Regions:
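Active-site-adjacent beta->alpha loops and helix N-cap segments on the catalytic face
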Residues: 127-135
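N-terminal helix-turn-helix DNA-binding module of bacterial transcription factors
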Residues: 1-60, 329-332
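Short beta->alpha connector loops
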Residues: 100-101, 122-127, 246
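Amphipathic helical "hinge" segments at domain boundaries
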Residues: 30, 45-117, 196-199
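Bacterial carbohydrate/catabolite-sensing allosteric modules
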Residues: 1, 42, 80-88, 136-143, ...
Length: 335
């Protein structure tokens, strides 16, 4: 990776001149500008955290990159991040990637050029080599709720696998005899661990079949489509564990459109604990994550890394809690 000193050497000027050119601070004559521009192009140099470190300054800005601004889970995370950042004198740049890897990479490139002090990632698409590249450029980062496989970085998340097992056990406890799972993207730790938790809970049971799982992509429309496909394959499904509340909302809508009563014909449980599960009828049982607390802790952790208070990578996993509501409150057989 080219450094500011490499650019200065190739252009035949001082590092201070390169710094003035990059920061548009002070006079640089036109001939020198052309030389610097050519050197930057030749070396494919990007002004980034290295230049920021040489300049010896911070911007008081952090970024949060997340995949879906329409998902209330990420809205609550963003609220917590902004609240804590403001307490410490930082401004937050919110970057919605729409779950598009190329858009995410564009954000990362722009954020490096604008000298943000650190980045919070709630990303589906970040790879372990992306993490290593950012670490090599001395950009503090924290992964929030998800992390790439084999990546060495700080993570704030919750106990997804344990929560999935709680959800399935609850559905069995209310009398479900055939439970399906609508799962999220398997490139995410959230989608992957919740699917594993489901499978570990039911794969030993006589009714289990791999065809009882269906992708829902963490979206409302994904939940609706998954229910349609699952019920076509297995009309006797009487319990559904959706891997997040957004998919659970879609599942509820589709079940009701199909004329199936929730919970008496099909009991339904989601995961996350977003407020939208309270405004539908019936209210949706969910495995609740402490979303706001996760956002607060991840921001404090990032700021401590920025300010040099901690050097080592840390992992924090929050407990989850089952909240039972109308979507699993079945009538007792003796009533």
């Amino acid at each position: 990776v080219a450094t500011i000193r490499d650019v200065a050497k190739l252009a035949g000027v001082s590092v201070a001149t390169i710094s003035r050119f990059l920061n548009k601070n002070g006079y640089v004559n036109e001939d020198t500008k052309l030389k610097v521009e050519q050197a930057i192009k030749t070396l494919q140099y990007e002004p980034n955290a290295i230049a920021r470190g040489l300049a010896g300054r911070k911007t008081g800005t952090i970024a949060l990159i997340f995949p879906d601004i329409t998902n209330p889970f990420f809205a609550e995370l963003a609220r917590a991040v902004e609240d804590v950042a403001r307490m410490y004198g930082y401004t937050v740049i919110l970057c919605n990637s729409d779950n598009q890897a190329d858009k995410e990479q564009t954000y990362i490139k722009v954020l490096k050029q604008r000298y943000v002090d650190g980045i919070l990632f709630a990303s589906y698409n970040l790879r372990s080599d992306d993490v290593e590249a950012l670490k090599n450029e001395k950009i503090p980062l924290v992964m929030l709720d998800r992390a790439p496989r084999d990546a060495s970085c700080s993570v704030v998340s919750s106990k997804h696998l344990e929560g999935a097992q709680m959800a399935v056990q609850h559905l069995m406890d209310v009398g479900c005899k055939k439970i399906a799972h609508i799962y999220g993207p398997q490139e995410t730790v959230t989608g992957r661990e919740r699917l594993i938790g489901y499978e570990q809970s039911v794969k030993h049971l006589p009714w289990y079949s791999p065809s009882l799982v269906e992708p829902g992509y963490f979206r409302v429309d994904g939940g609706m489509a998954a229910v349609e496909n699952l019920m076509q394959r297995h009309p006797d499904i009487d319990g559904i564990f959706a891997g997040n509340d957004t998919m659970a909302l879609g599942a509820l809508k589709k079940l009701q459109r199909m004329g199936l009563h929730v919970p008496d014909q099909v009991a339904l449980c989601g995961f996350d604990g977003i407020d939208l599960t309270l405004i539908v009828e019936p209210e949706i049982t969910t495995v609740s994550q402490p979303i706001y607390d996760m956002g607060m802790l991840s921001t404090r952790l990032l700021i401590k890394k920025i300010e040099g208070d901690i050097k080592e990578e840390q992992t924090h996993l929050f407990d989850v809690k089952l909240i039972t509501r109308g979507s699993t409150e079945r009538k007792r057989n003796d009533e």
